[in-house]
């Protein structure tokens, strides 16, 4: 009886049908970018200082320039008007409406030295140095409330983590297509609700809801496209699908530049996603999932449609279509199996660390660019472009060099780039951007390749469990990253870079402790997984190597 892969070899592994589905689903991949890293623009913190009643009137009466107004009325400004905690979060406790104040150094008429003036917190809000708006300027998320910006982004990653526990079940129980449509609808609605949220708390809840479903939408699209194409195209298709996310990053920089108001920006990236609901008529259900649910008639009908669109004749035995069974998957997996043997324990711990560190490095470098860049939009744009050569490097090296050395080298490069950035003066901004781009490229390579290695190191019956548990550390890393970046920068601006450097270098060294899996048969049992790197299993090598190329993580 023919399997889906057997039929695809005859009706087209990547024909017109697959190309059309691929392009449509890539739009979903691109739409995740504003959700994943939109904090860079939505949560942009401009220069700010306390608003003082009477200062504007005094400035107008005296004819001060903005620089003179700041110099006379704002405490703690450096020699070059550099921002500090005092200048941004404290104010002179002075009645600026009193008529005795002079226009030339007005505070000198009150005290001989400004340092003798009492200071107090900003009680009347802030003045922001920006023509646009962000959640920071609208809800005054600065000074004592600055941590709420971190929480805004952490809620997205918390949503990713919670959603992964539910969405995978929905996709396996009710189908990839239904899961895609439902999560897309909720993602779109929650995105619009975020844009119109009346207060910070409701905005936070809508953002959490969006995180819970948006990654599920992305994964559903990933699973569908990898199940539509033949085995020879799955790996390349999966990498290109992830590249579509990079296209979304590049486009986000342009959209954010054109729309500096955060509410309109949020609407601009949310409203178009309602069009994905039209996929109900253009993207069919996965034949593989239908076969797993014993719905053979509908699976056969879809395979006939694929053959027709590809201009091929379906095989005569198509009605006997079946799903290839894997006897090893009849064994029930448990969390303890991930730590049952010495090598499995080692692999699990290392993979958890790799997932955690690559999430921190990838998101952390994006946020660091947003917080320190001279030109937010250009710096974000340039650092996003480097993800394209990163994908090319993966395609070139994955079968020629392997997995372990590229992952280790990429981690080491990222860590070294972060540490070098500490010693680069601000005047050499181009060099800082170059190093940030180099680190971003390394983090991108790791993020994409660790997914494949994770699937190749576990035996079949715990492969999906291993993928789910280890990749959960990616979402946990994302939860902590905003606090690591923004709160540590308040202590010392270079402190996050030191942390990133240590994480990257440690991850690079730990990666070398993993066995190379290039060309090695996918392990079927715990014994085979335990012996990876010691000897190559010859059994089923030809057929299982095809599974290695598919990246079975797509089913998680």
Swiss-Prot record:
The modification Phosphothreonine is found at residue 543. A motif (Proline-rich sequence) lies at residues 284-288. Residues 43-150, 199-211, 260-263, 370-377, 425-429, 487-493 are extracellular. The modification Phosphoserine is found at residue 334. Changing residue 418 to A: Choline affinity is increased fourfold by MMTS. Keywords: Cell membrane, Glycoprotein, Ion transport, Membrane, Phosphoprotein, Transmembrane, Transmembrane helix, Transport. It is found in: Basolateral cell membrane; Apical cell membrane; Lateral cell membrane; Basal cell membrane. Residues 1-21, 172-177, 232-238, 285-348, 399-403, 453-465, 515-556 are cytoplasmic. GO terms for cellular component: apical plasma membrane; basal plasma membrane; basolateral plasma membrane; lateral plasma membrane; plasma membrane; presynapse. Changing residue 227 to Q: Loss of TEA and MPP(+) uptake activity. Involved in the uptake of clinically used drugs including diabete treatment medicine metformin, neurotoxins 1-methyl-4-phenylpyridinium (MPP(+)) and iobenguane and platinum-based drug cisplatin. Metformin competitively inhibits OCT1-mediated thiamine uptake, leading to a decrease in hepatic steatosis. Plays a role in the anticancer activity of cisplatin and may contribute to antitumor specificity. This is Solute carrier family 22 member 1. It comes from Rattus norvegicus. The lineage of its organism: Eukaryota, Metazoa, Chordata, Craniata, Vertebrata.
């Amino acid at each position: 009886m023919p399997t889906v892969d057997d039929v695809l070899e005859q009706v087209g592994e990547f024909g017109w049908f697959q190309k059309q589905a691929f392009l449509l689903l890539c739009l979903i991949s691109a739409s995740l970018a504003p959700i994943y890293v939109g904090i860079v623009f939505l949560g942009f913190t401009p220069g700010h200082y306390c608003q003082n009643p009477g200062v504007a009137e005094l400035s107008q009466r005296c004819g001060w320039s903005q620089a003179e107004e700041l110099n006379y009325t704002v405490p703690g400004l450096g020699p070059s008007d550099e921002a500090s905690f005092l200048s941004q979060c404290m104010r002179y406790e002075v009645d600026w409406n009193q008529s005795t104040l002079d226009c030339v150094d007005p505070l000198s008429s009150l005290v001989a030295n400004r340092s003798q003036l009492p200071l107090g917190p900003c009680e009347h809000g802030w003045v922001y140095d920006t023509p646009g708006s962000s959640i920071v300027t609208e809800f005054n998320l600065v000074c004592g409330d600055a941590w709420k910006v971190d929480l805004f982004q952490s809620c997205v990653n918390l949503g990713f983590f919670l959603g992964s526990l539910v969405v995978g079940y929905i996709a396996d129980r009710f189908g990839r297509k239904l899961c895609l449509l439902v999560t897309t609808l909720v993602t779109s609605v929650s995105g619009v609700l975020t844009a119109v949220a009346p207060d910070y708390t409701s905005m936070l809840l809508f953002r959490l809801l969006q995180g819970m479903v948006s990654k599920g939408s992305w994964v559903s699209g990933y699973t569908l496209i990898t199940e539509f194409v033949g085995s020879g195209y799955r790996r390349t298709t999966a990498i290109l699908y992830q590249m579509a996310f990079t296209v979304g990053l590049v486009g986000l920089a342009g959209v954010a530049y054109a729309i500096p108001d955060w509410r309109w920006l949020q609407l601009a990236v949310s409203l178009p996603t309602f069009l994905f609901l039209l996929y109900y008529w253009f993207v069919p259900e996965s034949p593989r999932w239908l076969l797993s649910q014993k719905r053979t008639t509908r699976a056969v009908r879809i395979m006939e449609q694929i053959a027709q669109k590809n201009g091929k004749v379906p095989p005569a035995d198509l009605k006997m279509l079946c799903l290839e069974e894997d006897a090893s998957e009849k064994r029930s997996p448990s969390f303890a199996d991930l730590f049952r043997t010495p090598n499995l324990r080692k692999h699990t711990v290392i993979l958890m660390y790799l997932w955690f560190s690559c999430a921190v490095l990838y998101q952390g470098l994006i946020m660091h660019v947003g917080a320190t860049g001279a030109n937010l939009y250009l710096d974000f744009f340039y650092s996003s472009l480097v993800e394209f050569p990163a994908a090319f490097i993966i395609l070139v090296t994955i079968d020629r060099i392997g997995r372990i050395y590229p992952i280790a080298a990429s981690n080491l490069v990222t860590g070294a780039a972060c540490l070098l950035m500490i010693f680069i003066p601000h005047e050499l901004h181009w060099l800082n951007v170059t190093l940030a781009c180099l680190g971003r490229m390394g983090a991108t390579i790791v993020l994409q390749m660790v997914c494949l290695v994770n699937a190749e190191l576990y035996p079949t019956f715990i492969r999906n469990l291993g993928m789910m548990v280890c990749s959960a550390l990616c979402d946990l890393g994302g939860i902590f990253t905003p606090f690591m970046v923004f709160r540590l920068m308040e202590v010392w601006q270079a402190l996050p870079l030191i942390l990133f450097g240590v994480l990257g270098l440690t991850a690079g060294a730990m990666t070398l402790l993993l066995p190379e899996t290039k060309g090695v048969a996918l392990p079927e049992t715990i014994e085979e997984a335990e012996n990876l790197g010691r000897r190559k299993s010859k059994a089923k090598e030809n057929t299982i190597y095809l599974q290695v190329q598919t990246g079975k993580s797509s089913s998680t």
